[in-house]
A protein has these predicted regions:
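Positively charged n-region of N-terminal signal peptides that target proteins for export
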Residues: 1-7
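Bacterial N-terminal signal peptides
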Residues: 7-17
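Residue-level hotspots at or immediately adjacent to binding/recognition sites across diverse folds
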Residues: 21-363
Length: 363
């Protein structure tokens, strides 16, 4: 069983205890409705303009128009299992994916949802979705499963990201204006198992695989510029990839050490140019590539974080185990340095530390 499924299983057990059995819509096929929905395990958040849409266990979908201060649960969601990812491309058009290879769609900004695709016989989830606009997109998931659409999801057709006989899980799909093909298209990336990164220059029609020689799972990534990427790996590994030219055929790879061994789950670019990373066990890390420093907080609550959004300067919204919470790196530092504080926050900051690189090391 992969680490991802172990993490999801743990989250399910932890979240069920905070929800009442009477809130389940048994035999209706509709998602759990509960006043405690924002305290359940949340697996992903997506921000479009000033609206945040979040998804989680039991088909829970929530929206916030005040940057996470308050949450409204979706009125109708025809799905009762775990949702894993969500994306909105406009104020009205949103998609969510999850277990049973399910793809949900909303045309009213997340209030009501319908099923665009599912396969309940395929006992595994879609793990990530990326819509380049309201028509074109791709979903990826467990055992190499991937689909694409060019008509807003009216039709989802099979596409081959990987033909590896091992059928490695495809954990995250994303693109960036920072990296473009020779034709000027935004390059699309899929991070997966056994150190594989898949690249498409034609919006997911065809794919090339880059073997990072890292044998563990890759969870997420982000493009820094045309020649640099940051990729999240297992056991707290941050892969800093530098391509030698714009063809992306040759590269060097360093492994940054953030002072922890927790799995890392999400990475976002901050307004000041730094990068923030969320992780399990209360981990939040900020990378400053210009000054080559890492700043890490292990929150006293030790709750696992699945997603992070910048609210304002040094104010971040976290989602994950037990719902949502706000975070400040300065508060974490002050709590750690204040010997009279009863907080269990831990904080550290250091110059980049590069781990010894061992090809095909899975740890």
């Amino acid at each position: 069983m992969s680490i991802f499924f172990k993490i999801i299983s743990l989250f399910l057990l932890l979240s069920i205890s905070s929800l009442f059995a009477s809130d389940f819509n048994y035999d209706t096929g509709l998602a759990l409705k509960s006043n405690l929905a924002d305290k359940a395990t949340i697996t992903s958040m997506n921000k479009h303009n000033d609206k945040i849409v979040a998804v989680g266990v039991h088909g829970i979908i929530l929206t916030s128009n005040d940057m996470g201060v308050s949450w409204i649960q979706a009125e109708k969601v025809p799905f009762t299992n775990t949702l894993t990812d969500v994306q909105c491309v406009s104020e009205s058009q949103c998609w969510a994916v999850g277990h049973d290879l399910t793809i949900l769609h909303s045309v009213d900004g997340g209030k009501n949802w319908s099923i665009q695709y599912d396969d309940i016989d395929f006992d595994a989830p879609f793990l990530s979705i990326h819509m380049t606009d309201y028509l074109n997109g791709i979903v990826v998931g467990a055992f190499g499963k991937s689909l694409k659409t060019s008509d807003g999801g009216e039709n989802w057709i099979s596409t081959v990201v990987t033909d590896d006989a091992y059928e490695p899980h495809l954990n995250s799909v994303y693109s960036s204006e920072k990296m473009k093909s020779e034709d000027g298209n935004n390059l699309m990336f899929v991070a997966g198992e056994i150190g594989q990164v898949h690249i498409s220059s034609d919006q997911g029609v065809s794919w090339n695989m880059v073997d990072t020689e890292y044998f563990g799972s890759l969870w997420d990534g982000i493009s820094v510029d045309q020649k640099r990427k940051l990729i999240l790996g297992m056991a707290g590994k941050i892969l800093y990839v530098k391509f030698s030219d714009e063809t992306l055929n040759e590269f060097s790879l360093d492994t940054l050490f953030a002072g922890i061994k927790n799995s890392l789950t999400d990475i976002k670019k901050l307004n000041n140019g730094n990068y923030i990373i969320s992780g399990n066990g209360g981990v939040i890390t900020i990378l400053d590539l210009e000054n080559e420093t890492t700043e890490t907080c292990i929150r006293g609550d030790r709750l696992s974080n699945t997603s992070v959004i910048e609210v304002s300067n040094d104010k971040y919204l976290l989602s994950g185990e037990k719902g949502f919470r706000f975070h400040s790196m300065r508060d974490c530092q002050n709590n750690f340095e204040d010997k009279s504080s009863i907080s269990k926050d831990m904080w550290m900051k250091s110059e980049f530390q590069y781990e010894e690189w061992v090809p095909y090391d899975w740890q």
